[in-house]
Amino acid sequence: MKIIGLTGPTGAGKSILTATAQRLGFKVIDCDKVARQAVVKDSEGLKALVKVFGADILLENGELDRKALARKAFSSPDNTELLNKTLLPHITALVEKECDSEYVLLDAPTLIESGLNKKCDAVIGVLADREKRLHRICKRDNISIDDANLRINAGKPDEFFKENCTVLIYNNGDSAEITEKFAEILTEIKER
């Protein structure tokens, strides 16, 4: 089994690359989706978050109020670290159950922080200019520039990814160009 990690800061444009990985025979595990599974109503992950951030992160029906959690979790680097420390063990356990294919791509913003990078044969980091990231985050999450800035500021700097990734891809331009480069990298890794 070959496991490839795909990571990078929020808004860098990792998600456009997953279809390429699937086309090349990789099972793609979207760790953001797994994270949502980890905090469904009455889950251990959600209970852990409530213990740390308080019951006001819940909607009236007992489900997670994502915006309320985001306001608290991204208000400071300490709170972001607390979010990751609380939730990552739950996410990691779910991800490990999904790694059941010859070729696996873990699409994971917190791949390195979770320790999942240690299970990877290679870690590909996707980076992009801050302005591009702001635009993508606002559009994707339907939030203000101020809220997008909070999310970027709460995340790891580019240097973190430069130090911890095997390969870096810069996603500032043409999506066809980046997907072609990504396909070349994955093909090379598969052939090792």
Where does each model-flagged region fall?
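Pre-Walker A (Motif I) flank of P-loop NTPase domains
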Residues: 1-3
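Hydrophobic anchor at the beta1->P-loop junction of P-loop NTPases
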Residues: 6
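Walker A/P-loop
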Residues: 15
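The conserved Walker
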Residues: 10
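ATP-dependent small-molecule kinase phosphotransfer cores
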Residues: 33-102
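Residue-level signal for inorganic ion chemistry
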Residues: 32, 83, 105, 148, ...
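NTP-dependent small-molecule kinase module
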Residues: 96-97, 101-103, 117-126, 131-143, ...
